[in-house]
């Protein structure tokens, strides 16, 4: 299973914000510059993260973006659930004629649940705490 670039960059943006001193604002432009991502793409990602309460966006001259809640409370699995379409196969009747008797869908759903359960063991704080090499790469100290 490969995460979409939308989810990948969403996780990266959250990691960047979690690496900053607590409560410090950043900008979408700063995040896009760090990762070399399209601003339009990042705006969509930040909007979805904001709607989910994971990012707080403040408008105005002194505005910016920051984590919407403490990094210790943001589980990686929850971020993936929010950003990633987790349907591995299309099991609609018009697409697949064995849907009524197929057991593969259940197996794949269980695999996704196991994947998410594993991701739920880690928080955003786990990704950034005591990680000087990360801070150096992101140019935050």
Swiss-Prot record:
Keywords: 2Fe-2S, DNA-binding, Iron, Iron-sulfur, Metal-binding, Repressor, Transcription, Transcription regulation
BP GO annotations: negative regulation of DNA-templated transcription
Domain HTH rrf2-type: 2-129
GO cellular component: cytosol
InterPro entries named among the record's database cross-references: TR_Rrf2-type_CS (IPR030489), Tscrpt_reg_Rrf2 (IPR000944), Tscrpt_rep_HTH_NsrR (IPR023761), WH-like_DNA-bd_sf (IPR036388), WH_DNA-bd_sf (IPR036390)
Entry note: cofactor: Binds 1 [2Fe-2S] cluster per subunit.
Record-given protein name: HTH-type transcriptional repressor NsrR
Disulfide bonds: none
Role of this protein: Nitric oxide-sensitive repressor of genes involved in protecting the cell against nitrosative stress. May require iron for activity.
Source organism of the structure: Pectobacterium atrosepticum (strain SCRI 1043 / ATCC BAA-672) (Erwinia carotovora subsp. atroseptica)
DNA-binding region: 28-51
Matching HAMAP family: HTH_type_NsrR (MF_01177)
Keyword Iron: yes
SUPFAM superfamilies the record matches: Winged helix' DNA-binding domain
GO MF, any single term: DNA-binding transcription factor activity
């Amino acid at each position: 299973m490969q995460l979409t670039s939308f989810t990948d960059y969403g996780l990266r943006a959250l990691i960047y914000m979690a690496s900053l001193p607590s409560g410090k604002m950043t900008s979408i432009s700063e995040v896009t510059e760090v990762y070399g991502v399209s601003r339009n793409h990042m705006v969509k990602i930040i909007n979805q993260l904001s709607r989910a309460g994971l990012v707080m966006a403040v408008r105005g001259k002194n505005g910016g973006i920051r984590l919407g809640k403490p990094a210790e409370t943001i589980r990686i699995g929850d971020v993936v659930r929010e950003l990633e379409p987790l349907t591995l196969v299309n099991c609609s009747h018009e697409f697949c004629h064995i849907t009524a008797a197929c057991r593969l869908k259940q197996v794949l759903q269980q695999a996704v649940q196991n994947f998410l359960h594993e991701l739920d063991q880690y928080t955003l704080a786990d990704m950034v705490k005591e990680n000087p090499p990360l801070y150096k790469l992101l140019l935050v100290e």
